[in-house]
């Protein structure tokens, strides 16, 4: 039994060395980029800004901000390394300055999945501050496959300031919303009016910006609706006027007419009861749905968006340090 355990440890050490990760006397595993390759990089678009450092044989460390969302930080693993629990976060001087004292920043939760460590905007800003000051960041926790084996992930500050400046420029060009936030939207109307109130314009302006920026948008489906008050024929005509008014708002601001599919339904598809004033207010609406098709060779992740399946039926929109 003792020989079997010793053999397992020797095999584990051989495998780790073959993978190119360091193993100390207690099989401490350290993942870090080689010094000559430990540069920070930026992927920039109007949809998302990504500041990241590739980590050899581990994955990557990422500062990400999608359009319309706060910034966050995460570690992405190629293969699972950390056990669930809490990792220690420490700051230390970089390799080329020699060994120095480590300063603890606290603990961070570790969860299962491709992103075992995730940090919100406030915590990610603290990490950025340490990297700008030329400090190394160290995440330390036990391995999921052996409790006695520590796993460490090291982030280097090399070329961070230059990349962060580029990242900030990207942030200034982000759209106000992302696809998930805008692809199903609803504009409401007052009483029997065929025109929406001015307070609905910001939503439509955000939608227009998105449609004009996304080359893979194929259709914007516009559906007009009314409440149950009045004659059905009158309501059908009113829903048509509302849908066309919204369509005109889009086309006069640059959305190509050929992208629009305009439909109207009168009172046929209520989303709430017409017996109350609140319900009727919800039913007086025009819904907009953005359909898009992106070739498989392209990735929504690179644009910072998540894929969504759409149907033809009219629908209402719905640190830690």
Name each region found by the language model.
Residues 2-15:
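Bacterial N-terminal signal peptides that target proteins for export
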Residues 26-177:
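N-terminal targeting leaders that direct proteins to extracytoplasmic destinations
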